[in-house]
Amino acid sequence: MTDTKQQISEELKKQIADDLRNFITTMAGGSANKASKMLKNVSNGYISIILNEKWDAISDDTWRNLQKQVGSTNEWKIVQTRGFKFLNMLFTDARLHSNTFGIIGNTGYGKTQTTEHIGNDNVFVVKSNEYFTSRTFLEELLRLMGKSGYGTTSASMMEVIIHTLLRLESPLIIIDEADKLNDKVLYFFISLYNALEGKCGLIIMATPYLKKRIDDGVHKSKKGYQEIYSRIGRHFLEVPKPSKNDIFAIIEANGITDELTKTGIYNKSECDLRSVKRLVHASLKQAEV
């Protein structure tokens, strides 16, 4: 059978190499070794060869694999903002030391986006929804682990989840947008903590409404709230607001360098990173006209 894949041109190789350099700078803190651990099937040796432009030994399939992961096409470039670094520090600490944290941050501060760039297979991020029941919450957690809870009881699903996590090296569960969960589902945080203390990292993360909800629940002696508050150390950690430098770096990484345009986007965004993304796209589209 004839190979119909297009050969990787020298020009495209140079573009992919530039995208790799940008990935190392913005996503891996300037460390090629860290980048190799974040990228799939891309060794530190490959990265060194590509950065030194000694490309003869690199196959086209390797180039294509790298392009999919760092390619500039129309993909939004992520920058290591203060919030990104803060969250990654907490995620790493919770994973390696089986710690438990409650994290809050205003919408648009990059919480969910940061969870999408965790380079570890043993991290399970539950994206909460208002419609979650106890069963659908457990089914989602099992799905993230590559397992099915179909046709089993909640107790059986919980048992599988716990046994699976206990066999993993440095596992971490992140319950994102936890303020969307009803009380009955939120109580699973207590059950998971009780079964996995010292064996698995646990994080609940949401907007500041979660803190208000927990504080109110503790004050009113609502069932389970004192237990949740105790397990996160009676303290919520706050994601820092994106700075002007953070937002300028994001704008520049995504193709806009004009100072006036950057300032305009910053002023309109109100430090909401989702708004920054929309404004950058609008500006780039306008420039094409």
Model region roles, listed by residue range:
Residues 102-107, 181, 193-224:
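Sensor-1/coupling segment of RecA-like P-loop NTPase cores
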Residues 237-262:
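Conserved small helical "lid"/interfacial subdomain of P-loop NTPases
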Residues 93-117, 129-130:
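Walker A/P-loop nucleotide-binding motif
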Residues 164-185, 189, 193-196:
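Conserved P-loop NTPase "ATPase switch" module shared by AAA+ and STAND
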Residues 1-97, 282-289:
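A short, basic N-terminal segment
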Residues 244-245, 267-284:
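The conserved phosphate-sensing helix
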Residues 128-168:
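Short glycine-rich substrate-engagement loop in P-loop NTPases that contacts/grips substrate
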Residues 126-131, 216-229, 233-245:
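Conserved AAA+ ATPase "SRH/arginine-finger" region at the nucleotide-binding site
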